[in-house]
Amino acid sequence: TGDALFIGDVGRPDLLASVGVTADELGVMLYDSIQRKLMGLPDAVRVFPAHGAGSACGKNLSTETQSTIGEQRAFNYACQPMSQEEFVAVVTEGQPAAPAYFLYNATLNKQERDVRDLDAAVPALTADQVEAALAAGAVVHDARDVQEFASAHLRGSINVPADGRMAETVGMVFSPEQQVVVIAPEGVEQEVATRFARIGFDHVVGYVADPEAYFLAHEDDVTRASRLTV
């Protein structure tokens, strides 16, 4: 069911509002998809949504990965019998703020795109290559945990740890066309680049092969921070 019908929720009709299509107009289309088409299917039909909880694509996404039309008819708030006006009102209110990259993704999803080769290795960058990338305007994404980042990091780098909802956060603080140099725990570099790619950010140029050695050789570019628990 893609991003139309989730388990416990339905898709957001507000993500293309800034390109001339209102949330109400898309809500009417969603009503037709959910109430008139999907809810017309037998209860036993199995439901496999595009994804589950862990994103801002809805306000009540389940952690389950599959369901049935019957279960959604019984328990999904948006699948209950209601008028078109009621449906549009209920699915447009109370939505979390959409990350900035959502509109970019919604537009990108309508275009023909090359399939990403997940086996293609992320390049390990030498010190000279890192310096050249930074001089050309690349930004540094430091994917280490916050304590390691605080102990030493490149001035101007942005710390978004690889654990948790990294992709959603980097989508808020990076722009899609920015060249990105990654500093990450050993063995995690490929995963970081893949998570960038999942939101359409395809410009990870490589990773710093040995961060500690790079920091020692570029001490003037390294800064430290203290942490405060509140």
What do these predicted ranges mean?
Residues 129-136:
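A short acidic-Thr-Gly-centered motif at the start of a beta-strand
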Residues 12-14, 20, 24-27, 71-114, ...:
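Rhodanese-like catalytic fold shared by cysteine-dependent sulfurtransferases
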Residues 1-95:
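Metallo-beta-lactamase
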Residues 118-129:
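A contiguous, basic/glycine-rich beta-loop/short-helix subdomain that forms a polymer-engagement track
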Residues 35-38, 131, 171:
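Generic structural signal for well-ordered alpha-helical scaffold segments
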Residues 49, 141-142:
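General beta-strand structural signal in soluble alpha/beta enzymes
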